[in-house]
């Protein structure tokens, strides 16, 4: 079953799903802006198109991830994003 989600007044939208190949995941698009997300469980984020500038928990330097690149976020934490262009992503819940 598909589950639609909307965050930050519609600037981030995602569709959650479960499949045998990826497990529980969501795909989405972020409009330009700055966002902070909290995690309940570990997440693996893959940038599909565009780019995300990311500040991960426990780090002091921002890092840019572009299409095809992956980063991991620990559970029970938060991470910060800067988005300069519409960017799509795949989020797997680990």
Swiss-Prot record:
Gene Ontology CC entries for this record: cytosol
Keywords, sorted A to Z: Glycosyltransferase, Transferase
Enzyme class: transferase
GO molecular function, one term: purine-nucleoside phosphorylase activity
CDD domains for the chain: cupin_PpnP-like (cd20296)
Keyword Translocase: no
InterPro entries the UniProt entry points to: Ppnp (IPR009664), RmlC-like_jellyroll (IPR014710), RmlC_Cupin_sf (IPR011051)
EC number: 2.4.2.1, 2.4.2.2
Reactions this protein catalyses: a purine D-ribonucleoside + phosphate = a purine nucleobase + alpha-D-ribose 1-phosphate; adenosine + phosphate = alpha-D-ribose 1-phosphate + adenine; cytidine + phosphate = cytosine + alpha-D-ribose 1-phosphate; guanosine + phosphate = alpha-D-ribose 1-phosphate + guanine
One Pfam family hit: Ppnp
Record-linked NCBIfam families: PRK10579.1
Family, similarity comment: Belongs to the nucleoside phosphorylase PpnP family.
Chain's role: Catalyzes the phosphorolysis of diverse nucleosides, yielding D-ribose 1-phosphate and the respective free bases. Can use uridine, adenosine, guanosine, cytidine, thymidine, inosine and xanthosine as substrates. Also catalyzes the reverse reactions.
HAMAP family: Nucleos_phosphorylase_PpnP
Name the UniProt record assigns to this protein: Pyrimidine/purine nucleoside phosphorylase
Organism of derivation: Salmonella schwarzengrund (strain CVM19633)
Organism lineage: Bacteria, Pseudomonadati, Pseudomonadota, Gammaproteobacteria, Enterobacterales
């Amino acid at each position: 079953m598909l589950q639609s989600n909307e965050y930050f007044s519609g600037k981030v939208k995602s569709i959650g799903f479960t499949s045998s190949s990826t497990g529980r995941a969501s795909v989405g698009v972020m409009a330009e802006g700055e966002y902070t997300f909290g995690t309940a469980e570990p997440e693996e984020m893959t940038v599909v198109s565009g780019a995300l500038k990311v500040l991960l928990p426990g780090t002091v330097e921002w890092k840019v991830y572009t299409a095809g690149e992956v980063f991991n976020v620990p559970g029970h934490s938060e991470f910060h994003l800067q988005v300069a262009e519409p960017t799509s992503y795949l989020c797997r819940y680990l």
